[in-house]
Amino acid sequence: MMNRIHAVILDWAGTTVDFGSFAPTQIFVEAFRQAFDVEITLAEARVPMGLGKWQHIEALGKLPAVDARWQAKFGRSMSAADIDAIYAAFMPLQIAKVVDFSSPIAGVIDTIAALRAEGIKIGSCSGYPRAVMERLVPAAAEHGYRPDHWVATDDLAAGGRPGPWMALQNVIALGIDAVAHCVKVDDAAPGISEGLNAGMWTVGLAVSGNEFGATWDAYQTMSKEDVAVRREHAASKLYAAGAHYVVDSLADLSGVIAHINARLAQGERP
């Protein structure tokens, strides 16, 4: 039992709940509008996904197109005080909205059950702050998704992604003996970096999450050609971030775990 996976550490939006990661993206658009009457697009809102939300807003302000709009309106770039104001608008909107995006993505419940049947523990972490997670976690539990542990982006003094700290806090809480026996699963590049920085195997999700950027209903009616183009776009970003594997969704994870177990048995490490 030594050379096998003992824990998976899962992201939330776009990985286990909220197909397409729509809860945070729509709220960023609304928060910019509410705080400063500045328009950003959904596509722009998606670019820094995976970071903590204050850092996400900061990164949005540095996007050339957003900075140009800000300069045109205010004659300067976005300041820390501006970020605070947008974050203050973001938080109540996100807390109110997140429960509406708490249903597990197709295949998640069955995959978790299969992993637990193999003795694998289920950790989790998120770019959401604790105030949002305290609404999301019980809502997801009502739908049947209950990880063994969760960490919010503002829980740790060291910080959040792309640093390793949230993933490593899961290792401590779950009592896992080696980071090489852990898999970090995420739909965005900062979460892949988090897993790599923590010394873990990493699996990117190309269809269920932020980079693919479609609702479940839109995905169901999409042409094979459109799916292939979007999948390739998402997979290329996740592989560029260093993902060891990229699959469509969490429903495909069990086969990856078996492959990693075979590599561990041969003495390989992440």
From Swiss-Prot:
One of its GO terms (cellular component) is cytosol. It is an enzyme of class 3 (hydrolase). InterPro entries: HAD-like_hydrolase_sf, HAD-like_sf, HAD-SF_hydro_IA, HAD_sf, PGP-like_dom2, Phosphonoacetald_hydro. Mg(2+) binds at D11, A13, D187. Keywords: Hydrolase, Magnesium, Metal-binding, Schiff base. The keyword Hydrolase applies. Binds 1 Mg(2+) ion per subunit. It comes from the Bacteria. The keyword Nuclease does not apply. The active site is at D11 (nucleophile), K53 (schiff-base intermediate with substrate). Its EC number is 3.11.1.1. One of its GO terms (biological process) is DNA repair. Involved in phosphonate degradation. Homodimer. Its cofactor is Mg(2+). The gene is phnX. One of its GO terms (molecular function) is phosphoglycolate phosphatase activity. It catalyses: phosphonoacetaldehyde + H2O = acetaldehyde + phosphate + H(+). This is Phosphonoacetaldehyde hydrolase. Pfam families: Hydrolase. Belongs to the HAD-like hydrolase superfamily. PhnX family.
